């Protein structure tokens, strides 16, 4: 844990300014609505956002651009592409031969980010390939199975995310259910754990509902008379799907892609449990900087880089779905 938690005067001033802005906004809202009742209901949310979103971002920004003594520096960002930088030695030493390979290429953080982006891309693509047909089936009014399937998708989400991930170990490990069945059928056991495939499986399992529900929300609100009109004009089912249904459901698709891609890039528990430490994603890297090394400065710099990626993803969502019709988990 970081020993020096002393903040400069300007950091305290920025936090005080944020609190002052909150009080001013509350006062203006009370004056505008002619009473305190409505603004009072909104004030807990505004205060929560300031305390747990705005102020943490200010602190991360402070640590990202300072060293341990509080002096301004850009070395924290330099460590992102320089594996020989001092702050990377702890992780590289723990990785052994793999760490030595990163040193020879000088790209431990860049490679980790690239691997995370690739895994997130694969996860998003698989979730889209599985989620769109599922959402289409759920929204089919003739089948009348939509509410039942929604419940079936929601029930696993009632269980803790960590427990759902750990549960896969009992299926994939060498003495797990799958290998037991293979051996009972006369086949040799296979290595299903501690590789990228297991990590990808865990990611798809956990994030698939975040792809299904936005698409289902949009499809369930779609006027299906448009599909009937397309059929009357001579379109077959496949043509109706690509010319009518898919274009109208794009807001949900974009929303689902964003909701799956962002947590996929930042996840760190799934690679640790199902990857067994053989795979490292960007979330693992940030977590190790904060908790293992206690290096809040470099960890904050890496967090800012991740925030930038998230902002880019959100901007793409905003551009593709300007009216916010993508839906969500309702």
What are these regions (language model features)?
Residues 2-10, 71-88, 268, 272-322:
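Interhelical loop and adjacent transmembrane-helix boundary motif
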Residues 2-62, 137, 147-151:
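N-terminal signal-anchor/first transmembrane alpha helix
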Residues 9-19, 93-138, 204:
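Transmembrane alpha-helix signature in integral membrane proteins
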Residues 20-34, 121-154, 227, 319:
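Transmembrane-helix boundary motif in ABC transporter permease subunits
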Residues 20-36, 216-231, 297-330:
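C-terminal transmembrane helix and the adjacent membrane-cytosol boundary/short C-terminal tail
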Residues 47-109, 171-175, 276, 328-330:
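Short membrane-interfacial helix/loop motifs at transmembrane-helix boundaries
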């Amino acid at each position: 844990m970081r020993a020096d938690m002393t903040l400069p005067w300007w950091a305290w001033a920025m936090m005080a300014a944020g609190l002052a802005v909150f009080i001013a906004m509350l006062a203006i809202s009370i004056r505008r609505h002619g009473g305190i009742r409505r603004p009072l209901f909104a004030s807990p949310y505004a205060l929560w956002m300031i305390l747990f979103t705005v102020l943490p971002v200010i602190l991360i920004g402070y640590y990202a651009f300072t060293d341990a003594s509080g002096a301004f520096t850009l070395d924290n960002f330099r460590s992102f592409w320089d594996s020989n930088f001092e702050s990377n030695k702890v992780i590289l030493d723990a990785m052994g031969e793999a760490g030595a390979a990163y040193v020879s290429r000088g790209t431990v953080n860049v490679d980790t980010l690239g691997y995370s982006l690739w895994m997130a891309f694969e996860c998003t693509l698989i979730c889209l390939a599985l989620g769109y047909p599922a959402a289409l089936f759920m929204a089919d009014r003739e089948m009348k199975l939509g509410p039942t399937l929604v419940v079936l998708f929601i029930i696993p989400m009632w269980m803790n995310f960590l427990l759902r991930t750990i549960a896969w170990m009992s299926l994939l490990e060498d003495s797990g259910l799958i290998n037991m069945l293979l051996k009972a059928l006369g086949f040799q056991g296979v290595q299903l754990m501690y590789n990228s495939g297991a990590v990808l499986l865990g990611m798809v399992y956990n994030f698939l509902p975040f792809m299904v529900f936005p698409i289902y929300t949009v499809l369930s609100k779609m006027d299906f008379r448009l599909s009937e009109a397309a059929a009357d004009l001579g379109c077959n089912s496949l043509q109706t799907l690509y010319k009518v249904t898919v274009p109208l459901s794009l807001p949900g698709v974009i929303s689902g892609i964003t909701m799956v891609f962002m947590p996929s890039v930042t996840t760190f528990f799934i690679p640790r449990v199902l990857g067994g430490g053989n795979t490292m994603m960007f979330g693992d890297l940030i977590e190790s900087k904060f908790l293992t090394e206690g290096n809040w400065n470099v960890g904050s710099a890496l967090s800012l880089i991740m925030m930038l990626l998230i902002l880019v993803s959100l901007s793409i969502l905003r551009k593709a779905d300007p009216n916010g019709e993508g839906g969500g988990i309702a």
